[in-house]
Structures are given as structure tokens and as C-alpha cells.
């Protein structure tokens, strides 16, 4: 099988090169052809020379983008490039900072023996971040499940068959949220248990603002569900409090309306036209191997 590993990067070459070394080690005993596609999101940091021997990787390409578009759109453009220009059977998207553990590639690939035609997702069973992030992630899961009806416990770290990649690049939500789009286009998914690793170098680049945007982008994929469930919630809530309405009791109503507005606003980031034209943002492609 030909498996492409897709890695977005922005100003974190040290981590990516360490990840390449670890991937090379982890796939050494797997009888498949592994290649790596790195999407460089217009990094301003100088890329060092690759001085390590990566004999188990068939090829390594760096797609250099003209303009910075963000992590989700790097993944979308990478999927588009691979589908249009590469020969492959599966794509494994993963973060370039070490938090998606290369040790789990074998689990993903082994599961293809049982789920060859399904996307396989890495469902988080353990996270390495601090207490605040874990709390925010817990709240995100509760809100997502309650207002969308979706249980999305995975991120980018997945193994996608070619048929799923084709669906993803023809879904406008992929331009805004990878995991949300995958949940939308593929209802039947297999999974492995995945532990969130620690960053190889430096602190996390995920700010609280970006965390909120990331969460709303996922929820926004299912904005119609959010609207319907929100209206039902408000009707039930108003019925229950109608005889004893206070200012404090109006707070949940305000929060729900705020959620609806935020979700519909952020869903405007979704764009099939921009996804279709994403390869025009490519400056050049470096072949490291």
C-alpha cells in the first residue's frame, strides 16, 4: 500500500524534522510504502538543512505556500494536492509538533486489515495539556454533543482511504474544520485509542482565542442541528421558568442566542471555491528526498 503522511507546519521546523526521524523509525518494520507531504504555511522561520538519514521514507516533499492560511486550510490544501497529484491508497494527516504520536501509526495501519474502506480516527483517551485546556476541551465536547448530536473525540490524526479523501475535498466544511467535515461526510468510522503526546519543543501555539475558533468551527459544520436543538431547548426552558422569570434566569437564553450567532458567523469560513482554488496558493515544491 502507498500511504501519504500529511503534516502542516508553521515556524516549527525543529519539531517537524524530529517527527520525520521518529516516523522513519516507527515505520521501519511496516511492509508498506510511506511518503511524507509537508505543507509549509508561509513560515518566516528559516528551514534548516535535512541532515538525518530517512531511508524508510520513500519520498519527502515540502509544499511551500505563498500566503499563511492556517492549520485547517493547510490540511485541506494538502488533501487536495495529494488527491490531484499523487498516487496513494491512504492519507494519514498528523500535527508536526509531536502531539500526534508516531508510535500510533502502526495501530492505524494494522486496523486497515479490518476496516480497509473506512476512515480510522484516533479517539483521545488521554491528553497532555494543562488543567485549563483539559477543562475547556471537556466543555467543548459537552456543547458539541448537546447542540449537534455528534460525538467528535478526534482531531486530525486519522487514516483516510482514497474514497474518503475524495469526499473531503468536495465538502466545503473541510476548508474550516477537518474533524467536523469528516464527521459530516463519513458516518461509519473505525477508531483506535490515542494518547495526546507532548510537544517536542516549546509551548503550545494554541491560544485561548484560537481554541474558541477551533471549537466553533467544528460545531458550525452542523449549524442547522444547532439551530433546531437551540430552539427546542429555549422552548422547554421558557416553559419551565415562565412563572418565575428573573434576570439571572435570562442568562442561559442570552448564552444560547450568542452560541447560535457565533456558530452561523464562523460557518461562513467554509468555502468549496476557496478549497478548489487552494493549490493556486502554492509557491513551489521542494523535494527533500
Where are these regions (language model features)?
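Donor nucleotide-sugar binding loop of glycosyltransferases
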Residues: 12-16, 43, 101
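Cell-envelope/extracellular polymer assembly enzymes that use nucleotide-activated donors
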Residues: 2-4, 35
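Catalytic donor/gating beta->alpha subdomain of glycosyltransferases that bind UDP-sugars
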Residues: 163-225
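A conserved acidic beta->alpha catalytic loop
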Residues: 40-49, 98-99
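Acceptor/aglycone-binding surface of glycosyltransferases and processive sugar-polymer synthases
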Residues: 65-67, 71-81, 90-93, 99-176, ...
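Terminal low-complexity segments of carbohydrate-biosynthetic enzymes
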Residues: 225-289
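Short beta-strand/loop segment that forms part of the nucleotide-sugar
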Residues: 32-43, 63-64
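Short, well-formed alpha-helical segments that are part of the catalytic scaffolds
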Residues: 12-27
Amino acid at each position: 500500500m502507498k500511504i501519504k503522511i500529511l503534516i502542516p507546519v508553521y515556524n516549527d521546523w525543529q519539531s517537524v524534522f524530529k517527527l520525520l526521524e521518529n516516523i522513519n523509525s516507527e515505520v521501519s518494520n511496516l511492509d508498506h510504502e510511506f511518503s511524507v507531504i509537508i505543507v509549509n504555511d508561509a513560515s518566516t522561520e528559516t528551514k534548516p538543512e535535512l541532515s538525518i538519514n530517512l531511508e524508510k521514507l520513500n519520498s519527502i516533499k515540502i509544499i511551500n505556500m505563498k500566503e499563511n492560511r492556517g492549520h485547517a486550510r493547510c490540511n485541506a490544501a494538502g488533501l487536495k494536492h495529494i488527491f490531484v497529484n499523487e498516487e496513494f491508497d491512504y492519507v494519514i494527516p498528523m500535527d508536526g509538533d509531536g502531539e500526534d504520536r508516531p508510535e500510533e501509526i502502526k495501530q492505524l495501519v494494522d486496523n486497515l486489515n479490518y476496516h480497509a474502506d473506512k476512515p480510522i480516527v484516533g479517539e483521545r483517551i488521554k491528553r497532555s495539556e494543562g488543567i485549563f485546556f483539559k477543562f475547556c476541551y471537556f466543555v467543548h465536547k459537552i456543547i458539541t454533543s448537546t447542540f449537534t448530536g455528534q460525538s467528535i473525540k478526534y482531531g486530525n490524526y486519522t487514516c483516510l482511504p482514497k474514497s474518503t479523501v475524495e469526499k473531503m475535498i468536495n465538502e466545503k466544511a473541510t476548508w474550516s474544520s477537518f474533524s467536523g467535515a469528516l464527521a459530516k461526510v463519513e458516518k461509519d468510522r473505525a477508531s483506535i485509542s490515542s494518547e495526546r503526546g507532548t510537544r517536542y519543543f516549546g509551548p503550545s501555539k494554541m491560544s485561548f482565542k484560537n481554541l474558541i475558533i477551533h471549537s466553533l468551527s467544528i460545531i458550525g459544520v452542523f449549524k442547522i442541528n444547532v439551530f433546531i436543538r437551540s430552539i427546542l431547548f429555549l422552548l422547554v426552558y421558557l416553559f419551565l421558568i415562565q412563572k418565575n422569570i428573573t434576570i439571572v434566569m435570562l442568562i442561559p437564553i442570552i448564552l444560547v442566542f450568542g452560541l447560535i450567532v457565533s456558530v452561523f458567523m464562523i460557518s461562513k469560513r467554509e468555502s468549496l471555491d476557496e478549497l478548489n482554488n487552494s493549490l493556486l496558493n502554492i509557491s513551489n515544491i521542494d523535494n527533500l528526498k
